Amino acid sequence: MVILGLGGLLGDAACAVLKDGELKAAIEENKLDHVWRPGGLPQASIAECLRLAGATRDEVECVALVRPFARTPESQMHSILRDQFPKAEIAMVEHHQAHAASAFFASPFEEATVLTLDHDGDFRCGTRWHAKDTQIQAEREWYYPDSLGRLYGAVTQLLGYRAGAEEHKVQWISASGDERYAPLFREVVTTSARLDPSFFDGHRQSEGGFSPKFFERLGIEEGTRIPAAAVPAIARGLQKTVEETVLGLAGEGENLCLAGGLFLNVMLVEFLERCGRWKKVFVQPAAGNAGTALGAVYHVWHQVRRQKRRGGMQSLFLGPGYGAEEIKQVLENCKLRFQYLRSTDDMLAQAVRMLGEHKILAWMQGRMEFGPRALGNRSILASPLDPYSTENLNVFIKHREPFRKFAASVPAEEAAEYFETGPNARYLATVGRVRPQHRKTFEAAILGQDMIRAHVVAEKDNPLYHRLLRKAGKATGLPVLYNTSFNLFGDPLVSAPRDAVRSFYSSGIDAMFVGNFLLEK
């Protein structure tokens, strides 16, 4: 049976395909069409996911569509999909139901509490669920405008960043702030998770929803720019309050599953991991709206068709990959000089040598990642042993603020030597802590409070990248590499070889490995 899921159709469109219970493909549309936050049906992703799954449109038995979706009337959307998938049933999936299914059925748990929190997916901004076997039942709901996601976005805008796009910057800034504004935000967010409209109202048009009373308590004149010195403390007050509030919403249970855009906040995830209330915490790593495409197919397979579970998500490498002939054709078409490395050992040896020479490498291997994070298949790599590596990554390639630190990839069997991490570090969906004896080595990557974006790489998850890390460790004594997504500022993650070539020659990357092909400047 082939099920096709469509989610994020208001602006983070994505497609996923489940075939006979196995997740075969998942792709965000913007990684293929390079349009910022594409809405509507993700036609390119649909075609590519079906190709990767080895399925035709006539073989699709169900199209699972996650609400809400653009301004197209539901009847018209059904008509469009019936034209494209003539033999398929059209199933509608509620937004938070899709988030919940994506979290629970991707997890390894047979029973769990599930918490989904976002901006306002379907007028609900949050739901707590109880999940067991193949069923997920809602226990409690929160409705807009009492939205923690909306509040986080409003503070993001207040601090001079883009709501809906740069909340992660507020998260990172918060790591260096004090808690002087935490009491104020605890008044904004009541103990029942309702937002006090005398401080903040999502329906208020002026000042991003904040009231004169809020600015008076903040000690800043309404309508003026927030002083730079106050920004970290405001960010910290918000982050601390959100963490405490979410802890109160999450309820009890042995296992906790998380999804929804708020849980792209890795510091929040780490707080829940470390609080000690649950034995295990799992966050669906593509927690935002694109990830509802996963939830759509899981919902139909498990909750509608009542099919047994198969052990959760096994991989996020669900996008397209490219063979040697496809890569070579692009390189020759671009009239580039390149070297073909005949063995994997030779390729790894060359990469380790260059990293030891403090060069910055682009690394494009295998199938593209689904979700917002690079996990070693579409990555830019540098050695922590180069004291200027993070500075060079920023100056010559990423052009981003110094407070945005780079991830550190480490083999799973050696991770405990360098970092304290939880299981969600497998997908870069949490943060870790640097061991005291290694603070100096990773000083440039520490966010504050010894936090670091640790990426734990198991051999079974990514054998080639794992080998690279191990070989780098043997050569230098440090099996850790800084890892950031292979894309330029403002662009999505590279998908195809031509994307990689464009990014390579538009940046200060020193060398690029695309499959077994090596390009140097």
Model-identified regions with their sequence ranges:
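Conserved beta-ketoacyl condensing-enzyme motif
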Residues: 57-80, 84
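Phosphate/ATP-binding catalytic cores across multiple sugar-kinase/actin-like superfamilies
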Residues: 236-256
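Extreme N-terminal starter segment of soluble prokaryotic enzymes
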Residues: 1-4
